[in-house]
A protein has these predicted regions:
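Acyl-donor (CoA/ACP) binding surface of acyl/acetyltransferases
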Residues: 1-29, 43-150
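Short loop/turn motifs at secondary-structure junctions and domain boundaries
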Residues: 37-43
Length: 150
């Protein structure tokens, strides 16, 4: 996995960028599992999400397929108090800018569960279209796609 080391992308007080030096102390539960997988995953690219200067979560591209130009997206905010404030929507919008401006990817995909309405709202606000059920879980999984326009 590549951990972003370049400039931060900003939208007001929200930004995505490189992790702080003591990364593991700031990431939400489960994120450390992604980091431990880093050496064996060349198909991942991750950012830390910041609210002002405070790390609040992560957002990443994973299962990046350079041949098809597609990538899945994962994201999480650590504290419940950080949810419902638009941070996830802004972080996803910033990731879309990064992808459009610096990669050759042509499609981003979010797979979420039917009961994760917050993730569905984030996807819709950022222009992702619901394209149907997921192959892995057709009863509960929902697929949202965004075509990169340059």
């Amino acid at each position: 996995m590549t951990i972003h080391a370049g400039i931060r992308y900003h939208d007001g007080d929200v930004s995505i960028g490189a992790p702080p030096p003591d990364t593991e102390a700031h990431l939400p539960l489960g994120a450390n599992e992604w980091l431990r997988a880093a050496p064996s995953r060349a198909d991942m690219y991750s950012f830390v999400v910041y609210d002002d200067e405070r790390p609040v979560g992560y957002i990443l591209l994973h299962d990046i397929d350079q041949q098809t130009g597609e990538s899945l997206i994962g994201y999480a905010l650590a504290a419940p108090s950080d949810r419902g404030r638009g941070l996830g929507t802004k972080a996803l919008g910033l990731l879309q800018l990064f992808v459009r401006d610096t990669t050759r990817l042509t499609k981003l995909i979010i797979i979420t569960s039917r009961d994760n309405e917050a993730s569905q709202r984030i996807a819709a606000k950022c222009g992702f279209l619901h394209t149907g059920p997921s192959r892995e879980d057709p009863l509960n999984g929902m697929v949202f796609e965004w075509v990169v326009r340059r």
